From Swiss-Prot:
Keywords: Membrane, Mitochondrion, Peroxisome, Transmembrane, Transmembrane helix. The keyword Signal does not apply. Its main location: mitochondrion. This is Transmembrane protein 135. It holds the Pfam family Tim17. GO terms for cellular component: lipid droplet; mitochondrial membrane; mitochondrion; peroxisomal membrane; peroxisome. GO terms for molecular function: lipid transporter activity. It is found in: Mitochondrion membrane; Peroxisome membrane. The keyword Transmembrane applies. InterPro entries: Tmem135 (IPR026749), TMEM135_N (IPR031926).
């Protein structure tokens, strides 16, 4: 409580908009910079999404631009209103407390801003910011010594999350929408209890392929011969009667799953590195080759490939041991498959999936009538989460995710780094630690406290 009541007499110019003594001019500068960056983010994002979703011409003519402008307005408002409430709170309270420069100013700004955004996007934004805020609070706790880090904690969290996700995936109506489609793509439809193929139809398809094969035997090339040999090996092997991978035995089923998802992971990481590689194409041509043999490409491939193969292998093993197919197998298989994150450790992925799992379970509780529904829950959670992240950006940026800090710098054209954090060190959070004792040059005519580096007018 003593830390909360501690205050400093500096005004908003001395702490916040140190580049200009005028609150109005600073507001306009932040607004313009945020709007420019917001349009740069959302214009290509919405355009690519429209192309991938195969939108009709009417969407491009009447809906695309309004949606871009609405999302850009939301993001712009979040930045512009923050500096507004920053100045307003200082004028109302007459001084700065430890909570006002960050959390206090960002909370109302975030609440008003999220109301501008479309309702269909609020849930996704809330999940992202809640995940980021949780990670930030965890880092704050570790920095203060109140939380002890657990070795490979992100892997353990992913194991638990994967176990629950795979259980819901196996249950009837357990998952819906994109999450169900994504898991079906990753592990395959053979692991769904309501598998659309019956043994008869599966074998019928195999027979049809064999008939076509006999008709083209003479024209069969060496590649086709090898493929035929591999197919025959895959089909003639141990497969439990409860297993639904009718065209593969259990061993080839796991191997194929690994190869498929390893390729997907490798290609995804390659695609993510393409923009940076082509940016240095003429200055550093060797970077183009590193696009293909980069370590992270193989790490993501190994992560996805081993996740699928371990999950499928464990599921098959449990069917052999118990002589039945049970949804509970997915809990064990999912947990063991989660160990694959050792190849590609990521706190961000673990936290995001855990947040999505909590959201899924919350809505399932609402459907079952066991959990109350809060109409403004997403708005409130977003506001609090964003306020926590802004507070960290002001008071202890060392505990904020680096990618989000870079985003805030882009949104404000670097002005977020110009705050007088040296004056905020009195609150004991090490606000200036990452800024190499940066002290802004201030006009003494507009300051309350004599500045350390006054502007020289001589």
């Amino acid at each position: 409580m003593a830390a909360l009541s501690k205050s400093i007499p500096h005004n908003c110019y001395e702490i916040g908009h140190t580049w200009n003594p005028s609150c109005r001019v600073s507001f306009l500068q932040i607004t313009w910079g945020a709007l420019e960056e917001s349009l740069r983010i959302y214009a290509p994002l919405y355009l690519i999404a429209a192309v991938l979703r195969k939108r009709k011409l009417e969407y491009y003519l009447y809906k695309l631009l309004p949606e871009i402008l609405q999302s850009a307005s939301f993001l712009t408002a979040n930045g512009a209103l923050y500096i507004t409430f920053f100045c307003v709170l200082r004028k109302i309270l007459g001084k700065f407390y430890s909570w006002t420069p960050g959390f206090g100013a960002a909370l109302p700004a975030s609440y008003v801003a999220i109301l501008i955004e479309r309702k269909s996007r609020r849930g996704l934004l809330t999940i992202y910011m809640a995940n980021l805020a949780t990670e930030t609070l965890f880092r704050m706790g570790v920095a203060r010594g109140t939380i002890t880090t657990l070795r490979n904690g992100e892997v353990l969290l992913f194991c638990i999350t994967a176990a629950m996700y795979m259980f819901f995936f196996r249950c009837k109506d357990g998952l819906k929408g994109f999450t169900f489609s994504a898991l079906r793509f990753i592990v395959g439809k053979e692991e769904i209890p309501t598998h659309s193929y019956s043994p008869e139809t599966a074998y019928a398809k195999v027979e049809q392929k064999r008939e076509k094969h006999r008709g083209t035997t003479r024209a069969m090339s060496l590649i086709a011969l090898v493929r035929s040999l591999v197919d025959s090996i895959c089909k003639h092997g141990p497969r439990h009667r409860c297993c639904k991978h009718y065209e593969d035995n259990c061993i080839s089923y796991c191997i194929k799953g690994f190869i498929r998802m390893f390729s997907v992971g490798y290609l995804i990481q390659c695609c993510l590195r393409i923009p940076s590689a082509f940016r240095h194409l003429f200055t550093e041509p060797s970077r183009l080759l590193s696009l293909f043999y980069n370590k992270e490409n193989f790490q993501l491939g190994a992560f996805l490939g081993s996740f699928v193969s371990i999950y499928k292998g464990t599921s098959c093993f449990l069917r052999w041991i118990r002589n039945l197919d049970d949804e509970l197998h997915a809990i064990v298989a999912g947990f063991l498959a989660g160990v694959s994150m050792m190849f590609y450790k990521s706190t961000t992925i673990s936290m995001y999936l855990a947040s999505k799992l909590v959201e899924t379970m919350y809505f399932k509780g609402i459907e079952a009538g066991k959990v109350p529904y809060f109409p403004q829950a997403d708005t409130i959670i977003y506001s609090i989460s964003t306020a926590i992240c802004f507070h960290a950006a002001v008071m202890e940026v060392q505990n904020l995710r680096p990618s989000y800090w870079k985003f805030l710098l882009r949104l404000t054209k670097g002005r977020f780094a110009l705050m007088n954090r040296k004056a905020l060190d009195v609150f004991g959070t090490g606000a200036s630690r990452e800024f190499h004792n940066f002290i802004p040059r201030l006009d003494p005519r507009y300051t309350v406290v004599t500045p350390e580096l006054p502007i020289d007018f001589s």
